[in-house]
Amino acid sequence: MRFHIMTLFPEIFNSYMDESIMKRAVEKGIIEVHIYNIRDFSNNKHKKVDDYPFGGGAGMVMTPQPIYDTYKHIITTHNINNPSVIYLTPKGKVYNQSMAKQMSLKEDIILLCGHYEGIDERIIDLIVTDEISIGDYVLTGGELPALIMIDSISRLIPGVLNQEESFEEESFKDNLLEYPHYTRPRDFEGLKVPEVLLSGNHKKIDEWRREESIRITKERRFDLYKKSNEK
């Protein structure tokens, strides 16, 4: 899997990609992360990448030329045909685990991080295949959403996690949120670990975890709870 990130702030990605799971995945050659500074591809002598919007309005809009030339460089350099180009925007479809699973099967994903008031619509018409949002709130740019997508997709790729089964137990499996976790000590500040988890009875432990997943999902994400009952 190769991730290609188009951004105005490449330094945001460096520290994250040099830590923990992502670092190991890159070192193993399971994933590649290529970062491109859109400003480097601007044909403006001052490397300007934004301009005032036609029709007026607040803020600036990212101009199409630097983005388009960055895109052409990526697909030419890496010989990519029919690429998935994802624009991170509040206007997009809300990202979820099902989308992450679908994307984990791809060979190349290009992530376009917007900034300012957004990007020229013609870029969306020309190269963008999907517009994706990570939630109903506004961020300064697309860099944090891009990191979220890279992390959530990468952990679904075989070999990235230490134990293949570990991601299958996590939240959103079967549309249920994850059950509570406990570790030592057994009693902390008067709060005790549920006795069933200390019983050694794996059947009862599994039942408790299932019941807790259902309870938590019903309380916090009723939309997912309804989906789980439809199966």
From Swiss-Prot:
Q: Name one GO molecular function term.
A: tRNA (guanine(37)-N1)-methyltransferase activity
Q: What is this protein called?
A: tRNA (guanine-N(1)-)-methyltransferase
List UniProt keywords, sorted A-Z.
Cytoplasm, Methyltransferase, S-adenosyl-L-methionine, Transferase, tRNA processing
Subunit annotation: Homodimer.
Biological-process GO terms, alphabetical: tRNA N1-guanine methylation
Catalysed transformations (reactions): guanosine(37) in tRNA + S-adenosyl-L-methionine = N(1)-methylguanosine(37) in tRNA + S-adenosyl-L-homocysteine + H(+)
Q: Which residues make up the binding site for S-adenosyl-L-methionine? A: G114, I134, G135, D136, Y137, V138, L139
Q: What is the lineage of its organism?
A: Bacteria, Bacillati, Bacillota, Clostridia, Peptostreptococcales
Which Gene3D superfamilies does the record match to this protein?
Answer: 3.40.1280.10, tRNA(m1g37)methyltransferase, domain 2 (1.10.1270.20)
What organism does the record attribute this protein to? Clostridioides difficile (strain 630)
User: Which PANTHER family would you find in this protein's record?
Assistant: TRNA (GUANINE-N(1)-)-METHYLTRANSFERASE (PTHR46417:SF1)
